[in-house]
């Protein structure tokens, strides 16, 4: 017997000796192994500077906010399905639509662009990472912290912000909207807005300074061009919003009187907000135009039609979007109607050029309608309808009739949902093998598309008619005598179908992660054109083990189909 050891300690030593003799160490419980794996993943996410991991964090977080915003939307549509107040008070309804709009514009669509940019843009230009990796990580954590500040208003005694996502003065003041919810909204958007500005600087620096040898500006993919000009557009827009929000907080907490209505502050706020707000529409649109422009040539088996004109259209949209902000203010009577109306009509021209090029790429192409192409076509249909209604309300006489009605709600959802959500899912299905090395299931993807497409059209098409009949936006209630009940019920049914459409996608992601087969090649679609399809799926830490020669705007296609490339070159000569 060993002196000085307790019986329990002796038993432990004997078991260890048996384990050594049999060479079969004791197995760690499954739960403990899972906790260790999760812990390591959390540490890796918290400390990473890898642009791909940060991009995945952006995509996952923004999609989480998208789901939360969708839940808030379904709660609103539940209230509006029938006349009378069923579920919420007027104040609670105000909180729902305020946080819904804020999430969808500033916590979902904007960081979603940063997510796709982080993952894809360095691959497309042959860069090993972003120019400032640590700044990139800081930007993500600032976005997450700011977003949590905004939604944490629901946990305060007075509830979340309730003055609408564009927070018109004087309703945004502490007098009319007291409580910490408004302050959390204001400062949360300051933090997340600074994050977006820092990301824009990072993206511009990367595109200008870190392109691979041979990757000239006019060999860059259209997606990267759109990211460049989106980031340029962020630089004047977001600092204006940040400054306006800081002045608003000074009003609320320190009595600064910047936005007092007696001093013209109400109109000042509108000018400052919409000087940010309309460029913001294109900040969240241009990257998704780029995603669609990457997808259509691959499934048309053709190069993009009109590469240079697409770049020119992007430049024109960038500059025109900065001079149309006051078309949101026609009804104030305090803006130059002819100028802003003309500029609003004019911005439709470069957008029409893009449609011409997208359709021109498909004409006489060998089209195949895999899931990414379906989503791209859904984008074309939906965004076109939204753009047509936008041309209508660019006319001041029509805008006077339709402003602040459900026609505006329908228009903005056709433009923004039609662009961001349809192109987001197109990008997910297209680049998922590049993200993870596995293809999402095609059958589930098609179920997802058609369910969402039908749900979206059912929800928002009828809202044009509601607005034309005079139903105001942001009302929690209406009378049966108003005649809005039938269309509101249809819209609410569509909203729940829209919500249910997300379930096939979530199941598809889980099923692919658990049981999906590795694609095993650089380009699972077979006709990828840009440089990300010339590296493994998923890529290594610094993206490329070797770079192919870059002699055109389609380096991956040149690499994988040299015979076609040589034939095309001989044909051109």
From Swiss-Prot:
Cofactor, how bound (note): Binds 1 copper B ion per subunit.
Q: Which UniProt keywords are listed?
A: Cell membrane, Copper, Electron transport, Heme, Iron, Membrane, Metal-binding, Respiratory chain, Translocase, Transmembrane, Transmembrane helix, Transport
Positions annotated to bind Cu cation: 278, 282, 327-328
* GO CC annotations on file: plasma membrane
Membrane spanning stretches: 53-73, 103-123, 141-161, 188-208, 227-247, 272-292, 304-324, 329-349, 373-393, 412-432, 447-467, 490-510
Question: Which co-factor is required?
Answer: Cu(2+); heme
Q: Pathway, per Swiss-Prot/TrEMBL? A: Energy metabolism; oxidative phosphorylation
Give the GO biological process terms.
aerobic respiration; electron transport coupled proton transport; oxidative phosphorylation; respiratory electron transport chain
Q: Where is this cross-link: 1'-histidyl-3'-tyrosine (His-Tyr)?
A: 278-282
Q: Name one GO molecular function term.
A: cytochrome-c oxidase activity
Could you say which enzyme class this protein belongs to? translocase
Give the EC number.
7.1.1.9
What domain of life is recorded for the organism? Bacteria
Membrane topology annotation: Multi-pass membrane protein
Sequence positions that bind Fe(II)-heme a: 100, 413
What the entry lists under CDD domains is as follows: Ubiquinol_Oxidase_I (cd01662)
Instruction: Give the reactions, separated by semicolons, that this protein catalyses.
Output: 4 Fe(II)-[cytochrome c] + O2 + 8 H(+)(in) = 4 Fe(III)-[cytochrome c] + 2 H2O + 4 H(+)(out)
Extent of the signal sequence: none
The residues the record assigns to binding heme a3 are 411
Where in or outside the cell is it found? Cell membrane
Role: Cytochrome c oxidase is the component of the respiratory chain that catalyzes the reduction of oxygen to water. Subunits 1-3 form the functional core of the enzyme complex. CO I is the catalytic subunit of the enzyme. Electrons originating in cytochrome c are transferred via the copper A center of subunit 2 and heme A of subunit 1 to the bimetallic center formed by heme A3 and copper B.
**Subunit structure comment from the entry:** Associates with subunits II, III and IV to form cytochrome c oxidase.
The text of the family note is: Belongs to the heme-copper respiratory oxidase family.
This one is known as Putative cytochrome c oxidase subunit 1-beta
Q: Which organism is it from?
A: Streptomyces coelicolor (strain ATCC BAA-471 / A3(2) / M145)
High-level lineage: Bacteria, Bacillati, Actinomycetota, Actinomycetes, Kitasatosporales
- Name of the gene this protein is made from: ctaD2
């Amino acid at each position: 017997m060993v002196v000085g050891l307790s019986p329990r300690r002796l038993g432990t030593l004997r078991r260890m000796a048996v384990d050594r003799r049999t060479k079969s160490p004791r197995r760690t419980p499954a739960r403990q192994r899972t906790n260790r794996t999760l812990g390591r993943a959390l540490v890796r996410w918290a400390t990473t500077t890898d642009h791909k991991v940060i991009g995945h964090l952006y995509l996952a977080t923004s999609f989480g906010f998208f789901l939360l915003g969708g839940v808030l939307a379904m709660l609103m549509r539940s209230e509006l399905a029938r006349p009378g107040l069923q579920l919420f008070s007027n104040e609670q309804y105000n909180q729902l639509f305020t946080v819904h709009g804020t999430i969808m514009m500033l916590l979902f669509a904007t960081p979603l662009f940063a997510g796709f940019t982080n993952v894809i843009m360095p691959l497309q230009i042959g860069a090993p990472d972003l120019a400032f990796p640590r700044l990139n990580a800081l930007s993500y954590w600032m976005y997450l912290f700011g977003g949590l500040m905004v939604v944490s208003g629901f946990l305060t005694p007075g509830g979340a912000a309730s003055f609408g996502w564009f927070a018109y003065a004087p309703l945004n003041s502490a007098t009319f909207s007291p409580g910490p919810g408004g302050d959390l909204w204001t400062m949360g958007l300051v933090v997340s807005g600074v994050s977006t500005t820092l990301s824009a600087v990072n993206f511009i620096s990367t595109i200008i300074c870190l392109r691979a040898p041979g990757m000239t500006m006019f060999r860059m993919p259209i997606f990267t061009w759109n990211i460049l000009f989106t980031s340029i557009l962020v630089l004047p827009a977001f600092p204006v919003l940040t400054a306006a929000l800081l002045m608003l907080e000074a009003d609320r907490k320190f009595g600064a009187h910047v936005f007092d209505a007696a001093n013209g502050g109400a109109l000042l706020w509108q000018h400052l907000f919409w000087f940010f707000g309309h460029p913001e529409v294109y900040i969240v649109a241009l990257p998704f135009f780029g995603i669609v422009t990457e997808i259509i040539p691959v499934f048309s088996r053709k190069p993009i039609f009109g590469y240079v004109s697409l770049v020119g259209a992007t430049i024109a949209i960038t500059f025109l979007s900065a001079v149309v902000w006051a078309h949101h203010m026609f009804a104030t009577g305090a803006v130059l109607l002819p100028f802003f109306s003309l500029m609003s009509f004019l911005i439709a021209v470069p957008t029409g050029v893009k449609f011409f090029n997208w359709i021109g790429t498909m004409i006489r192409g060998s089209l195949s309608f895999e899931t990414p192409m379906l989503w791209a076509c859904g984008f074309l249909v939906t965004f076109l309808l939204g753009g047509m209604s936008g041309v209508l309300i660019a006319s001041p006489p029509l805008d006077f009739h339709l402003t602040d009605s459900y026609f505006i709600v329908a228009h903005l959802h056709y433009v923004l949902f039609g662009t961001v959500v349809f192109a987001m899912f197109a990008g997910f299905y297209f680049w998922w093998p590049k993200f993870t090395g596995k293809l999402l299931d095609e059958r589930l993807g098609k179920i997802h598309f058609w369910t969402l497409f039908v749900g979206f059209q059912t929800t928002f098409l009828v809202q044009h008619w509601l607005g034309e009949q005079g139903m105001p936006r942001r009302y929690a209630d209406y009378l049966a005598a108003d005649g809005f009940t039938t269309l509101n019920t249809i819209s609410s049914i569509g909203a729940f179908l829209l919500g249910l459409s997300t379930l096939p996608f979530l199941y598809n992601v889980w099923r692919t992660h658990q049981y999906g087969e590795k694609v095993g090649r650089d380009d699972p679609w077979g006709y990828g054109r840009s440089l990300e399809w010339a590296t493994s799926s998923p890529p290594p830490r610094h993206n490329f083990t070797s770079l192919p020669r870059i002699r055109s705007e389609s380096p991956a296609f040149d690499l994988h189909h040299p015979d076609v490339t040589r034939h095309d070159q001989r044909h051109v000569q």
